Amino acid sequence: MMKLMLFSIIVILFSLIGSIHGADVPGNYPLDSSDDTYLCAPLGENPFCIKICRKHGVKYGLMLRLPCWCEYFGKIKNVKI
């Protein structure tokens, strides 16, 4: 019985790890007209990055590391802001 319970816990943990890693959303860092990324703060979701991503035709973005990162943004296209 103890082995079955331990096995069940291990299976559940591996499923959780798989679901966390499987949630990667594709995206990219948008560039301005000078081929630079947009730096913003604070880390995480912020209005400036969302505004930049919307200018690039994407609904949502956030600060990931230092530059803004846009979800589902594949091709890098320069936009004059």
Swiss-Prot record:
Q: Would the keyword Iron-sulfur be found if you checked this record's keyword annotation?
A: no
What the entry lists under CDD domains is as follows:
neurotoxins_LC_scorpion
| Signal peptide as annotated in the record | 1-22
Q: What is its main location?
A: secreted
Q: Which GO terms describe its molecular function?
A: ion channel inhibitor activity; sodium channel inhibitor activity; toxin activity
Domain of life where this protein originates: Eukaryota
Cysteine-cysteine disulfides: 49-68, 53-70
Q: Name one GO cellular component term.
A: extracellular region
Q: Which Pfam families match?
A: Toxin_3
Q: Print the keywords alphabetically.
A: Disulfide bond, Ion channel impairing toxin, Neurotoxin, Secreted, Signal, Toxin
Q: Do you know which SUPFAM superfamilies this protein is assigned to?
A: Scorpion toxin-like
Start and end of every LCN-type CS-alpha/beta domain?
Answer: 25-81
Q: In which tissues is it expressed?
A: Expressed by the venom gland.
UniProt subcellular location? Secreted
Report the function annotation for this chain. Probable neurotoxin that inhibits ion channels.
Sequence similarity: Belongs to the long (3 C-C) scorpion toxin superfamily.
Entry note about domains: Has the structural arrangement of an alpha-helix connected to antiparallel beta-sheets by disulfide bonds (CS-alpha/beta).
Q: Which protein, by its recorded name, is this?
A: Toxin-like peptide AaF1CA5
Q: Which organism is it from?
A: Androctonus australis
